[in-house]
């Protein structure tokens, strides 16, 4: 039977997977994970919003009249186009990849001074 032959052939090998979340693989240095926005550097130009195809970023007006991006983590495809387009380097790509949550409000990163 071919299935037993396959089991005997592959059984002595080391396992290919990890016991996640108890064991974690090292994240590559060029990994593109969740983005972080430094709202102190952001001038609200909106270039990141224009570049974001899945509309994970949107400009919101703060009470002081300035505009800052709101980040919808669940919509993001982690393409880092917003990182490349930001003239002030206010957006950075992190190595954070564990983004699952039970709280839908945690999926939206609001600029300071706004609430949803």
Q: Where would I find each of the regions flagged by the language model?
A:
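Basic, alpha-helical nucleic-acid-binding regions used in initiation and control of genome expression
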Residues: 79
């Amino acid at each position: 039977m071919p299935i037993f032959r396959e089991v005997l052939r592959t059984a002595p090998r080391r396992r290919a997977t990890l016991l996640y979340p108890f064991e974690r693989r090292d994240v590559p240095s060029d990994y593109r994970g969740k983005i972080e926005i430094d709202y102190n550097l952001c001038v609200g130009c909106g270039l990141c919003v224009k570049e974001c195809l899945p509309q994970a970023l949107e400009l919101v007006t703060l009470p002081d009249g300035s505009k800052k991006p709101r980040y919808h983590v669940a919509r993001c495809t982690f393409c880092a186009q917003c990182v490349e387009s930001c003239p002030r380097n206010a957006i950075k790509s992190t190595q954070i990849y564990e983004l699952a949550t039970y709280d839908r409000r945690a999926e939206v990163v609001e600029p300071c001074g706004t609430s949803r």
